[in-house]
Design a protein with these regions (language model features):
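N-terminal intrinsically disordered, cationic/polar leader segments
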Residues: 1-30, 43-108, 114-129
Length: 129
């Protein structure tokens, strides 16, 4: 199964693609091919957006069966729309082939100050119980 985990906030996006779908053997797996096309499109869009200055802080790591990337972007940007389109396509694949891939939205990326604030609020809640 391929697991796709992503975090999205108003200014930052991060995603990881991990594993082989297992729909068919390597080279004949249409689910894995669909996921690979979408991951590749996202990486190409990131490279172009980085060159044009639309995104900043772009990072990408690739290994066999694993891709992780992250970047910062503006609210109304082309990359924001690209991310939403690719996530929608991944969700459609998941709907059809849910036994072979899973798309997981994780908590939005927070700044350190927001994270510390939330930790303090959680601690207050635990103390009140």
């Amino acid at each position: 199964m391929t697991e796709i985990k992503y975090r999205d906030s108003a200014a930052r996006f991060a995603v990881s693609f991990c594993g082989h779908a297992g729909y068919a053997e390597c080279g004949k797996d249409i689910v894995c091919a669909g996921i690979s096309v979408l991951a590749s499109e996202l990486m190409l869009a990131c490279e172009q957006a980085q060159r044009s200055g639309e995104i900043t802080d772009y990072r990408c790591a690739e290994e066999s069966g694993y891709v992780k990337l992250s970047f910062s972007y503006g609210e109304g940007s082309f990359m924001r729309r690209t991310v939403r389109l690719i996530l929608a396509c991944l969700r459609l694949l998941e709907k059809e082939y849910g036994s072979y891939l899973r798309v997981v939205a994780q908590s939005p990326i927070q700044s350190q100050s927001q994270s510390r604030y939330n930790e303090g609020e959680n601690q207050k809640e635990r103390m009140a119980l």
